[in-house]
Regions:
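Active-site catalytic microenvironments for nucleophilic, acid-base chemistry
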Residues: 58-62
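P-loop (Walker A) phosphate-binding loop of NTP-binding proteins
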Residues: 43
Length: 162
């Protein structure tokens, strides 16, 4: 790749950086989950979807996650490998009362083919949204070519949304 840049590096010296007032990150789960893009990865069938569901419900309720406070707000869980019945069954397993501030969706557009607009529309309708979970990433990718370049491109789109 030949990306010649005709300008010098833009740097900041240590003193200037230390003197610059910067905003701390906003945490959805205090000290654990900051605003932004995160990837939950692990072996198949170890409970990642259960964890995602529990996290969506717990944050929507404003309850602590492992003794860490949460920023209560609307959550959106794109559970793209599940049916509504499966989600309901799992909800009954983890809680007696799911709040109306946790939303579930089993179908959505792909990255670059409408997903960004769908999420933006949801966020506009629910401005207090603090967490969006996509389960699984592969279900929203338009190309099933797992090259680094495609990974980077797709994750960059999601990072801009975050």
């Amino acid at each position: 790749m030949n990306n010649k840049m005709n300008h010098p590096l833009i740097t900041v010296d240590g003193r200037t950086l230390m003197d610059r007032p910067l905003e701390p990150p906003n945490f959805v789960v205090d000290t654990l989950l900051a605003q932004g893009l995160h990837i939950l990865a692990g072996s198949p069938k170890v409970g990642k979807s259960w964890l995602a569901l529990w996290l969506a419900v717990t944050v929507a309720k404003g309850k602590p996650v492992w003794n860490m406070s949460t920023k209560q707000g609307t959550t959106l869980y794109l559970c793209l490998e599940d049916s509504v019945l499966r989600i309901q069954n799992r909800l009954f397993e983890i809680t007696e009362d799911a709040p109306d501030s946790v939303h579930f969706c089993t179908e959505c557009a792909l990255i670059g083919q409408g997903l960004e607009e769908q999420v933006d529309t949801f966020l506009a309708a629910h401005p207090d949204t603090v967490l969006v979970i996509i389960d699984t990433l592969q279900m929203v990718r338009p190309v099933h070519d797992a090259t680094y370049a495609n990974d980077y491109k797709d994750l960059s789109v999601l990072k801009r949304l975050a």
